[in-house]
């Protein structure tokens, strides 16, 4: 049963493949293809097919289990399905003959028969014989599949006779055919079927094949199958046909010729290849690997089919080709991208056609490599070419490989770039030409359409050249420009007509009549008509302006972020914060005042005498003062000491104060010069912040022999110098003393020093103190217009550069506080800086003691805004007008500026205000002295202003407060000695923007503060301090007449010659002399009207009386008590609510407005307000002004009187333009007061604190030049580093050496150099200007100037030589007299400056400009010396000559011809100095006294 159920086993056949075998002699170099035929049939997959099989084996391999010492191979079996579906198993045996690799003879085996007989054997036996796979299997059987021959024996069922029909290898086909014939004979004996396989038909030789076919025909029609194992053609057919012969039940196979079978097979391969390639093309990343892709595709049928037919190796090759194609495609795209990017790179690196137009490609490449942006556009690879590096994978790196430029494509792009630049240049030229054509067409108006203009330019060459789009673009740009310009001019016009808008209250709405008036006035303006075609825009601008006028805020300001209020707040926020930090550092430096260091300066042994006197009064250098012991360290220095400046300030000795003692005009002159030098040096180099506050005290030594003759002059000149320098003056006490110095003098001076130190500590206290505004003595409002062409730093620098400047009350971001000595006391002044639009509300609602009105002399709108604002200011409030421009030369060169400056000064003259011009290119505006006289005037009118303000606010009230501000307790200090700001005492600028015509004589405004004594000397008007000072400050002192001066019996008359000089000077002055004491002896004076006539003008309740103390100049020092009785208010009292504090000249009137005092202001108002004001009302308004001003206005003339001492005694406070007409007017209304002679009660003026530059100790800077150089290195290392840095990085910097660098950076450069002389300035990231400033500071720090003082006179004389060649040779000989060290450094510096001047077209620094900036540093001038001031221009021209003729002076070169060579100035006689100093050469706006005499007595023209 079981046997029946078993499935029948498929039939099994054994086929023996035979053919020519044997040694190489028998078969040639290669076999006939038996092994390949078997391999392809048994293992048909391409990866399992091995084309190479060898029959030469070693003995070991022959004895292995695969060969097993037999000459046949067992290839295994394969199960085959027939066409009828019947399976059969075919075992394949290959009969061969193995050759020994040693003897090259057949191996000996168990069967010793020859191959022909062995091959015909039908029974084969070999125990444990393994299946053969390939040659590599031999000896490594364990690494391959191990399959044994079934049962170790097989019976052969048929033979497959292989005949090679190819050309063969060293084998004759006839020999093969003969061998085959013999073999066939043996095979026939076995009675087994035989089929002939014609092998290697892919290399078939046709006649060989025909012979095989003939052979088969002769042998009982043997079947011949044409095969090719390489291409797998008809291999299976051979075995199938043989099986069919064995099993007749199977269908007879169809034998296909080789060519037909090959085509069929190749078609199958091609189809599989196409499918595989499509499969491979799905891979898009050329970074993909075969391993990754094959793992993904191994189960895909198309992949498997191709692998079976062609094999993995071909599949990998196909994949590699595809990947390479992807890579090349990527490289191609990158190359195209680079080529497309090249034009942009060329535009970046080679934009200038003139530079590259004539360069070839290689030269252009070299030029590109030098560009700073080269690395941004190109990358230079270490390995080339670029497409074989990993750069192709850097997708994010868009830089072009530089080696790509070596291709022809890149060169072609470059040529196209050049051509594009040429055409673009032509196109731009034609567009600009067309633009100029449009600009020449006058009738093109804003808003005019292109169509209306096009017909007028049709024939224009440029229009024809450019495209229509370009034409429209150019016209659109032209329209935008003219529209924008028209709108700006329209807006500027609105500001110029500010009087038309600023007549209504804030937050008001203009009426229709007002709008009609505005349009009527503006319609006459061309700038109004210019926007005719843009009427909606014009109306919008007008409404926007009106909205801003009536609702002015920072947010609505038409200047936006450039609003003055915003700029001021930002500047104050940063400046005051930095100032606080500096004060904290200064506070910590000023610690111990138990020990006082005093520097004593004198001449002819005076300093040592004073030091001896102080030591006499001390005990072991300890001095008792006011119950406290102070250790004194005295440092007396005589004027003759050559190292006087270096001794003043050393690391071991830092003085708390300086006593300057004098006993003659000569010694006083020396003191003035010395202090001027110190202050000049301190302001230029700023050695230490502490030195800025160093107090000076002038001490007059007693003269026992000639007290009656010289003492009054010395006292007057000493006091005058002290006032000028803002420092205390210690006079000789009254009485006779045996010694030169009195104990009271020393104590008074020492107290002053201690008070100054104490005040400095209070000023720089790190504890922030926000004092209430009510504590400010004065409140000043500075107004500036938004959009003016100057920085707010220019107008704020006089305050911010002062050490006494501090922040105002919290919340007042636009205010600052200034501590300044005004009159006899230190005052706190609140400065509020506002735009004009913000000031309107302040003007109407808040108490203001004075206005500083700033305007730009370059802008009419600025003057218009000033006029509109000033017109509504009450005429009781002092005003200072400030015109701002670049330089004094603008007045000469620009008529518009000249007109505006003249108008400003004219208005100031009309309203008796002050007028000042500030120049942005000058440094003088950084001194608060610009406003000193104005502050004094404001203080004088303070009470009147406050009462006027109080009256306006409480006009309906019957009760008035006596004082507006509470008195400040500090006004009662018995001793007021405070250091003034840096600016109040800063020396005049080293040079003037125009030249050397500096006014050295005191102006009338300055002289009004002095009166003449009996001997013709001017005395400052001041009084003795007492505890009631605050009452006299805040109450109105009645005008008094001084009692007759009682002559002292011991006063001697002046030298008659001096007296005649003074009288002659006064006689030349046409001013009234009633304001001065007559030039007569005391006994000749009339005393009939010399008593006080008090008028108390402070309004009080009826019946109220008070006592006010006044201090007339009484020689007996008596205090006169005056009772003031108040009666019922007059009509004026009732009308104004108060009684005017001024003298009868002012009358009892209500305050008016400035527009009624100025013809200029009123004429403007009249032209605008003609719709609302009649002519009669205008005349009436002016009538009142006329009656009050009649006879008061007069011109001022220069007083030719010169003080017998130096120029600083003339009261020169401001070289800027200043007009002080009102001070002169006061001389008519007030009687002068004589100075009290009692110096014990004299007020102390503030001390001078020269600013310092360096605030650290240095072993390098400030040292003598000889200590900083060696024979090997004659140039100081610091100078060398600075010059190299400047020449390497900033030679073309605009304004080099003129534009100031950052002060902190300059200090850091020197500090870092102090620590490490090898520093690299480039690594410090500092600006060129900072390095230039540090270089100038180095020379300013030197103990002696680089150009020695001893050679200054010789240089001066040589510069006056008329002949240029002779002058240059004389200067050259003087330079040779320099110390060798100075000569080397001077040559180095001048050579550097010459290089700088050579770049003047870029840096704008000509030799002239450089000499202006450098000559004060190189020559260290004494600006307090009158003779030196008169020669400043000569010294500057000498330095300019050195710079221009550098090659001639130092390198034996030729004289260079220059266009602006400065001719030698005419020689001046020192005796004629007065005439040369009279400022007649300056224009009227710059010297007001030249205009005022030409004005009518009544400037308004009413009479």
From Swiss-Prot:
GO biological process: cell migration; epithelial cell migration; mammary gland development; positive regulation of epithelial cell migration; positive regulation of mesenchymal cell proliferation; regulation of cell size; signal transduction
Entry keyword annotation includes Cytoplasm: yes
Keyword entries, A-Z: Cell membrane, Cytoplasm, GTPase activation, Membrane, Nitration, Phosphoprotein, Repeat
GO cellular component: cytosol; endoplasmic reticulum; plasma membrane
Region (Disordered): 975-1004, 1022-1050, 1069-1091, 1129-1157, 1169-1255
CDD domains on file: pseudoGTPaseD_p190RhoGAP-B, RhoGAP_p190
Domain pG2 pseudoGTPase: 779-944
Start-end of Pro residues biased regions: 1036-1045
Organism of this sequence: Mus musculus (Mouse)
Residue intervals of the Rho-GAP domain: 1263-1450
Biased composition (Basic and acidic residues): 1141-1151
Site (Arginine finger): 1298
In-chain residues carrying the UniProt-annotated modification 3'-nitrotyrosine: 550
UniProt tissue specificity: Expressed in spinal cord, cerebellum, kidney, testis and lung.
GO MF, one annotated term: GTPase activator activity
Subunit structure: May interact with RASA1/p120GAP.
Chain positions with Phosphoserine modification: 590, 765, 951, 968, 1115, 1196, 1203, 1219
Lipid bilayer topology: Peripheral membrane protein
Listed name of the protein: Rho GTPase-activating protein 5
């Amino acid at each position: 049963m079981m046997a029946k159920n078993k499935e029948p086993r498929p039939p099994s056949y054994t086929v023996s493949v035979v053919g020519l075998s044997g040694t190489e002699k028998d078969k040639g170099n290669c076999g006939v293809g038996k092994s390949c035929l078997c391999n392809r049939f048994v293992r048909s997959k391409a990866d399992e097919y091995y084309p190479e099989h060898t029959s030469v084996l070693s003995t070991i391999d022959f004895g292995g289990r695969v060969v097993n010492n037999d000459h046949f191979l067992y290839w295994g079996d394969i199960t085959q399905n027939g066409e009828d579906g019947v399976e059969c198993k075919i075992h394949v045996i290959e009969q061969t003959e193995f050759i020994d690799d040693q003897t090259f003879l057949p191996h000996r085996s168990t069967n010793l028969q020859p191959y022909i007989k062995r091959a015909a054997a039908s029974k084969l036996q070999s125990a444990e014989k393994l299946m053969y796979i390939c040659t590599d299997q031999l000896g490594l059987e364990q690494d391959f599949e191990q399959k044994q021959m079934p049962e170790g024996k097989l019976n052969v069922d048929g033979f497959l006779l292989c005949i090679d029909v190819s050309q063969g290898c060293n084998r004759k086909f006839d020999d093969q055919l003969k061998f085959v014939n013999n073999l066939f004979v043996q095979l026939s004996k076995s009675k087994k079927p035989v089929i002939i396989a014609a092998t290697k038909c892919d290399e078939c030789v046709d006649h060989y094949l025909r012979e095989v076919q003939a052979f088969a025909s002769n042998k009982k029609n043997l079947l011949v199958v044409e095969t090719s194992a390489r291409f797998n053609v008809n291999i299976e057919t051979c075995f199938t046909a043989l099986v069919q012969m064995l099993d007749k039940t199977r269908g007879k196979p169809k034998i296909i010729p080789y060519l037909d079978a090959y085509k069929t097979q190749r078609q199958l391969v091609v189809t599989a290849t196409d499918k595989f390639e499509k499969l491979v093309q799905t891979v898009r990343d050329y970074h993909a690997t075969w391993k990754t892709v094959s793992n993904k595709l191994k189960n895909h049928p198309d992949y498997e089919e191709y692998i079976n037919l062609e094999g993995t190796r071909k599949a990998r090759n196909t994949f590699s080709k595809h990947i390479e194609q992807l890579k090349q495609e990527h490289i191609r795209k990158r190359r195209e991208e680079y080529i497309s990017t090249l034009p942009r790179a060329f535009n970046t690196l080679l934009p200038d056609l003139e530079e590259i137009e004539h360069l070839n490609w290689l030269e252009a490449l070299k030029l590109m490599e030098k560009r700073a942006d080269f690395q941004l556009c190109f990358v230079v690879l270490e390995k080339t070419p670029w497409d074989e590096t990993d750069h192709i994978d850097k997708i994010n790196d868009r830089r072009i490989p530089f080696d790509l430029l070596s291709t022809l494509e890149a060169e072609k792009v470059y040529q196209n770039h050049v051509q594009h630049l040429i055409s673009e240049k032509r196109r731009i030229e034609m567009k600009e030409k067309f633009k100029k054509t449009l600009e020449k067409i006058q009738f093109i108006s804003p808003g005019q359409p292109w169509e209306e203009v096009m017909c007028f330019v049709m024939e224009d060459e440029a229009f024809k050249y450019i495209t229509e789009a370009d034409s429209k673009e150019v016209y659109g740009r032209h329209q935008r420009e003219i529209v924008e310009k028209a709108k700006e001019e329209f807006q500027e016009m609105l500001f110029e007509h500010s009087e038309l808008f600023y007549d209504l209250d804030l937050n008001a709405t203009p009426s229709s009549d007002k709008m009609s008036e505005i349009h009527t006035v503006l319609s006459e303006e061309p700038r109004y008509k210019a926007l005719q075609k843009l009427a909606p825009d014009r109306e919008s601008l007008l409404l926007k302006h009106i909205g801003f006028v009536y609702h002015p805020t920072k947010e609505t300001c038409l200047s936006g972020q450039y609003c003055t209020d915003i700029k001021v707040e930002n500047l104050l926020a940063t400046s005051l914060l930095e100032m606080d930090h500096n004060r904290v550092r200064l506070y910590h430096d000023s610690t111990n005042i138990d020990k006082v260091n005093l520097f004593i300066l004198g001449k002819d042994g005076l300093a040592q005498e004073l030091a001896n006197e102080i030591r006499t009064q001390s005990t072991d250098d300890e001095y008792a003062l006011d119950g406290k012991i102070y250790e004194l360290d005295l440092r007396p220095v005589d004027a003759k000491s050559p190292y006087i400046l270096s001794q003043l300030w050393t690391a071991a000795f830092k003085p708390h104060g300086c006593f300057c003692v004098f006993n003659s005009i000569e010694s006083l002159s020396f003191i003035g010069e010395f202090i001027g030098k110190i202050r000049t040096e301190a302001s230029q180099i700023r050695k230490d912040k502490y030195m800025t506050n160093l107090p000076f005290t002038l001490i007059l030594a007693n003269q026992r022999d000639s007290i009656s003759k010289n003492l009054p002059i010395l006292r007057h000149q000493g006091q005058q110098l002290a006032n000028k320098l803002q420092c205390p003056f210690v006079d000789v006490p009254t009485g006779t003393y045996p010694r030169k110095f009195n104990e009271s003098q020393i104590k008074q001076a020492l107290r002053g020093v201690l008070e100054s130190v104490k005040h400095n500590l209070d000023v720089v206290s790190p504890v922030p103190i926000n004092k209430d505004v009510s504590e400010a003595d004065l409140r000043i409002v500075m107004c500036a217009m938004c959009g003016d062409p100057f920085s707010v730093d220019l107008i704020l620098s006089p305050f911010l550069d002062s050490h006494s400047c501090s922040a105002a009350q919290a919340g007042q971001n636009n205010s600052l506080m200034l501590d300044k000595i005004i009159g006899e006391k230190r005052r706190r002044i609140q400065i509020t800086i506002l735009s004009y639009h913000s000031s309107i509300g302040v003007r109407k609602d808040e108490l203001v003691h004075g206005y500083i009105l700033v305007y730009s002399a370059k802008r009419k709108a600025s003057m218009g805004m000033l006029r509109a604002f000033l017109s509504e200011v009450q005429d009781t409030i002092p005003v200072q007008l400030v015109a701002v421009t670049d330089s004094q030369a603008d007045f000469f060169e620009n008529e518009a500026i000249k007109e505006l400056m003249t108008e400003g000064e004219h208005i100031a003259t009309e309203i008796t205000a002050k007028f000042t011009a500030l120049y942005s290119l000058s440094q003088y505006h950084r001194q608060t002295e610009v406003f000193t006289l104005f502050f004094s005037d404001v203080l004088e009118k303070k009470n009147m202003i406050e009462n006027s303000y109080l009256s306006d606010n409480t006009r309906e009230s019957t009760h008035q407060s006596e004082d507006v501000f509470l008195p400040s307790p500090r006004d009662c200090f018995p001793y007021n000695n405070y250091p003034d700001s840096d600016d109040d005492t800063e020396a005049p600028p080293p040079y003037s923007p125009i030249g050397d015509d500096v006014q050295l004589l005191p102006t009338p405004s300055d002289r009004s503060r002095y009166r003449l004594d009996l001997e013709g000397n001017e005395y400052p008007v001041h009084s003795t301090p007492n505890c009631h000072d605050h009452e006299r400050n805040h109450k109105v002192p009645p005008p008094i007449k001084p009692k007759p001066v009682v002559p002292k019996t011991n006063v001697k008359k002046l030298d008659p010659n001096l007296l005649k000089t003074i009288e002659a000077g006064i006689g030349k002055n046409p001013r009234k002399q009633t304001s001065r004491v007559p030039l007569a002896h005391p006994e000749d004076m009339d005393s009939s009207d010399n008593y006080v006539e008090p008028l108390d003008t402070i309004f009080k309740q009826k019946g109220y009386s008070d006592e006010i103390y006044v201090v007339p100049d009484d020689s007996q020092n008596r205090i006169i008590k005056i009772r003031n009785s108040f009666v019922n208010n007059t009509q004026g009292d009732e009308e104004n609510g108060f009684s005017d504090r001024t003298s009868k000249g002012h009358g009892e009137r209500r305050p008016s407005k400035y527009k009624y005092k100025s013809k200029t202001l009123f004429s403007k108002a009249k032209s605008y307000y003609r719709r609302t004001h009649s002519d009669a009302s205008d005349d009436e308004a002016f009538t009142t002004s006329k009656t009050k001003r009649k006879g008061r206005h007069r011109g001022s003339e220069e007083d030719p009187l010169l003080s017998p001492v130096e120029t600083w005694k003339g009261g020169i406070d401001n070289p800027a333009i200043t007009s002080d007409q009102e001070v002169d007017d006061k001389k008519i209304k007030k009687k002068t007061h004589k100075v009290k002679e009692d110096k014990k009660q004299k007020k102390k003026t503030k001390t001078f604190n020269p600013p310092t530059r360096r605030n650290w100790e240095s072993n390098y800077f400030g040292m003598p030049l000889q200590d900083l150089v060696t024979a090997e290195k004659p140039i100081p290392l610091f100078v060398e580093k600075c010059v190299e840095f400047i020449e390497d990085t900033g030679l073309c910097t605009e304004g080099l050496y003129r534009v100031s660098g950052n002060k902190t950076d300059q200090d850091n450069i020197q500090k870092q150099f102090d620590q490490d002389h090898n520093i690299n300035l480039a690594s410090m990231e500092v600006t060129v200007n900072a390095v230039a400033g540090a270089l100038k500071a180095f020379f300013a720090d030197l103990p002696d100037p680089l150009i020695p003082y001893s050679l200054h006179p010789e240089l001066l004389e040589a510069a006056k030589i008329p002949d240029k060649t002779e002058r240059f040779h004389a200067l050259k000989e003087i330079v040779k007299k320099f110390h060798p060290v100075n000569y080397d450094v001077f040559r180095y510096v001048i050579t550097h400056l010459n290089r700088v001047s050579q770049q003047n077209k870029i840096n704008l620094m000509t030799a002239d400009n450089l000499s202006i900036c450098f000559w004060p540093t190189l020559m260290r001038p004494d600006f307090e010396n009158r003779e030196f001031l008169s020669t400043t221009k000569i010294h500057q021209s000498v330095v300019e000559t050195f710079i221009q003729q550098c090659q001639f002076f130092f390198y034996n070169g030729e004289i260079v011809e220059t266009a602006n060579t400065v001719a030698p100035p005419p020689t001046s006689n020192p005796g004629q100095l007065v005439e040369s100093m009279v400022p007649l050469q300056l224009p009227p706006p710059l010297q007001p006294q030249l205009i005022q005499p030409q004005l009518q007595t009544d400037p308004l023209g009413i009479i």
